[in-house]
Amino acid sequence: MILGEEESWVSERTRAEVLKELTAAEQPYELVPGSVFGRECLRFKSAPPTLRELFSESRSDVEFIIYEDQRLTFDQAYIEASKIAMILVNDYGIEPGDRVAISMRNYPEWILAFMATTSIGGIAVAMNALWQPEEMAYGLDDSGAKVLLADEERLARFAQIAER
């Protein structure tokens, strides 16, 4: 279909008008004053207070992650992420506020690592998977990450700088 001068896919409403409507009282994305880490801000009234609760509330048998022939439901992903979270806490001493670097391709494990880290109050440091050893070293040093979760290719790169 070719649009004439009188037809348009663009609404006359501005982005600001739409946002104001969606975030107004009694609307799906109502914003209310709140505090996050001691800082006053606006937050979604109906949102779970933490990502951990969001992940927990999302548990179901619906497929969540599909990669090649691998399929994980929301529930399976939650269980796998919980296992990783326990390792981060019990074996590596990760506590809320600690940074955990994630360096890998777009594998299902990336999502699980993010879920695990944020569910225990950690800060996920997403590292560029294309970074070379020197860039990885800078990212790790600059972020203050206590742990690196990486795939085999990134671990091989990390091995070149690990002795520092």
Q: PLM features: what roles do these ranges have?
A:
Residues 1-47:
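Flexible, non-catalytic linker and terminal segments flanking ANL/adenylate-forming cores
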Residues 23, 54-61:
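Flexible acidic/glycine-rich loop/turn elements at helix↔coil and beta-strand↔loop transitions
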Residues 26, 33-35, 46-48, 76, ...:
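Solvent-exposed, flexible loop/coil residues
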Residues 37, 60, 122-125:
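Residue-level signal for pocket-adjacent positions within structured domains
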Residues 42-47, 52, 61-115, 132-138:
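Conserved AMP-binding/adenylate-forming core of the ANL superfamily
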Residues 57-58, 91, 142, 164:
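Alpha-helix C-cap/termination motif
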